[in-house]
Structures are given as C-alpha cells and as structure tokens.
Curated annotation (Swiss-Prot):
Mg(2+) binds at E85. Binds 1 Mg(2+) ion per subunit. The magnesium ion binds only when substrate is bound. Binds 1 Mn(2+) ion per subunit. This is Isopentenyl-diphosphate Delta-isomerase. Mn(2+) binds at H23, H30, H67, E111, E113. Keywords: Cytoplasm, Isomerase, Isoprene biosynthesis, Magnesium, Manganese, Metal-binding. Its EC number is 5.3.3.2. It comes from Halorhodospira halophila (strain DSM 244 / SL1). GO terms for cellular component: cytoplasm.
Length: 175
C-alpha cells in the first residue's frame, strides 16, 4: 500500500496517509512534485496520462508528477519518478511551489497538493516511456502549449493548465 506525505498549508510534513484515501472526499493536502524537462531546442516533454491512471486519465500534462515517499526528499523523488516514467534520469532543479485543488468528476477523486515544480534538461530526444503510465508523449514549444491550453483546456490536467498560464515556463526552457 502506497502512502503520501500529509503537509500543513506551509508545506511542512505532518504525517502520512494511504494514497487513494488522500485523494478521496475532496482530498487531503499532501506533498507532490511537477517535473518539466526540456530539450536543447527549448521544447517541453509532454505526456498524455495513460487511460489506466486512477485519476485525470487520458489528459495531457507536464513531463511527470508524483509524490515523495515518507522519508524521501522532493528532488530525489522527482528524479526517481522521471526514470520510472520516461526511462532516463537528469539533474532537476526547483523553480517554484504552489498549492492547488482539483476534482476529477469522472472518478470522484481529487488532488489537493502542495507541489514543488522542478525543471531539467533531457539527455535524449527519444525517451523510453512506461506504457502503464504514459499513453503518448511529444515535444512542444511552451508558447504553442500555452495557446493550446487556452483553446482546448479540457485536453489538459488542471494543474498543468494553471502552471502553463501562470508561470514563466518559456523562461524555464532557456534558463
């Protein structure tokens, strides 16, 4: 049984809870991360979440997301998860933090997360995605993604839409 780290509104660890339970009944505030990996052309590696994911399945999103395990650091967890989902590792650097709440009306589950945003550079243009996690992937320019999320918002996860509209993602690509 997987557990997530429960946090207070300032992101301080206060306990643990079973993963699915933390996403039920409107969600419990827990620790998470969102990874953005760019290639040398400044394009972002996007993923379409696999149809088998327990919530927000089939939607396009940032490179990967996840939860640190109890006792695991955020950067360590993000680098681990990137390897699990895309088959490569790279050094990740924190650039932002945000709290968000989003309900998946198809499953009745919710995300209520204190999330760290980390960025990195891809060591390859040809990742090896895990098909149980990732239904499709592509490289895309941040400005194209920003326009697409405005025109077709329901194609994207709610946290990714918020980040792509509110954060300087194009600057992260060149930073």
């Amino acid at each position: 049984m997987e557990h997530v780290v429960i946090v207070d509104p300032e992101g301080q660890r206060v306990g643990t809870e079973e993963k699915i339970r933390a996403h039920a009944d409107g969600g419990t505030l827990h620790l998470a991360f969102c990874v953005f990996v760019f290639n040398p052309r400044g394009e972002l590696l996007l993923q379409r979440r696999a149809d088998s994911k327990y919530h927000f399945s089939g939607l396009w999103s940032n490179t990967c997301c996840g939860h640190p395990r109890p006792g695991e650091g955020v950067t360590e967890a993000a680098e681990r998860r990137l390897g699990e989902e895309f088959g490569f590792v790279t050094r990740l650097h924190p650039v932002a933090q945000f709290t968000y709440h989003a309900e998946d009306h198809h499953t009745g589950l919710a995300e209520y997360e204190y999330a760290h945003v980390l960025i990195g550079r891809a060591p390859t243009d040809q990742p090896a995605p895990d098909p149980l996690e990732i239904g499709a992937w592509e490289w895309a320019a941040p400005l194209r993604i920003q326009a697409d999320t405005q025109q077709y918002p329901l194609r994207y996860t709610p946290w990714f839409r918020r980040l792509i509209q509110e954060q300087p993602v194009a600057d992260w690509a060149t930073g």
